């Protein structure tokens, strides 16, 4: 765990930590420019994005949850001919996304309270879903199911084991949480997803733990 030094009274520090834990987007608002400058430009996620693309129809609709500034994942999907809607709770990150892709649709929303009038061929929650507290994560699988067409694909990242962690980025604390793999499997099964791929700690992809699943409602 990495936290900024205690430079305020203990109660204020505790309240600040709890706010950062429950609403990571507030931290991203503070580091949006830093993140845009320091996130690696290369698409190390490409093998997973390419596999997803092979499972989608031409010009498929994709919902990018936690799209950030849209680079590099959303940009790559757009270049491939897909229709992408970006959602993020960070206003500052979304401002950058709109500058990067002015012709695209972006929505300022917390994924936990998602409200969109469309269903999609795929949902991506890459390095965004795992910023939610563990107590909020199970509820997301109903949301994933609600916004996918039958046969739609879900691509998300998690931790490799149950727990919490903090990382210091641009001088701000970023909270991460994960359930364990069996919990995710049960949640996917309960919400009628079939697991296509589960890779743990992929060293070629920044040690990401990646899930790809298909929504097959009965």
Regions found by a protein language model. Name each.
Residues 151-158:
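Conserved beta-strand signature within the Rossmann-like core of class I S-adenosyl-L-methionine
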Residues 200-218:
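Core SAM-dependent methyltransferase catalytic element
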Residues 124-125:
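A conserved beta-strand element that flanks and buttresses the S-adenosyl-L-methionine
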Residues 14-57:
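Conserved class I S-adenosyl-L-methionine
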Residues 138-150:
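A short glycine-rich, Lys/Arg-flanked "PGG" loop and its adjoining helix->strand segment in the class I
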Residues 181-198, 215-218:
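A SAM-dependent methyltransferase catalytic signature shared across enzymes that methylate proteins
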Residues 63, 69-113:
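Class I SAM-dependent methyltransferase SAM/SAH-binding core
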């Amino acid at each position: 765990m990495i936290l900024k030094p205690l430079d305020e009274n203990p109660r204020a520090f505790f309240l600040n930590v709890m706010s950062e834990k429950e609403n990571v987007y507030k931290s991203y608002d503070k580091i949006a420019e830093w993140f845009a400058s320091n996130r690696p430009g290369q698409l190390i996620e490409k093998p997973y994005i390419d596999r997803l693309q092979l499972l989608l129809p031409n010009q498929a609709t994709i919902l990018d949850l936690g799209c950030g500034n849209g680079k590099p994942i959303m940009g790559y999907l757009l270049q491939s001919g897909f229709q992408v809607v970006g959602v993020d709770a960070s206003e500052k990150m979304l401002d950058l996304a709109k500058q990067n892709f002015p012709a695209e649709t972006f929505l300022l929303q917390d994924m936990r309270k998602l409200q969109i009038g469309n269903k999609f061929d795929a949902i991506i929650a890459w390095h965004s879903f795992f910023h939610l507290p563990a107590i909020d994560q199970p509820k997301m699988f109903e949301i994933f199911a609600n916004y996918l067409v039958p046969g739609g694909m879900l691509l998300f990242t998690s931790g490799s084991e149950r727990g919490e962690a903090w990382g210091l980025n641009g001088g701000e604390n970023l909270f991460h949480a994960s359930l364990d793999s069996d919990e995710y499997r049960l949640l996917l099964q309960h919400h009628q997803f079939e697991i296509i791929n589960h890779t743990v700690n992929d060293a070629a992809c920044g040690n990401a733990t990646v899930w790809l699943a298909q929504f097959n409602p009965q």
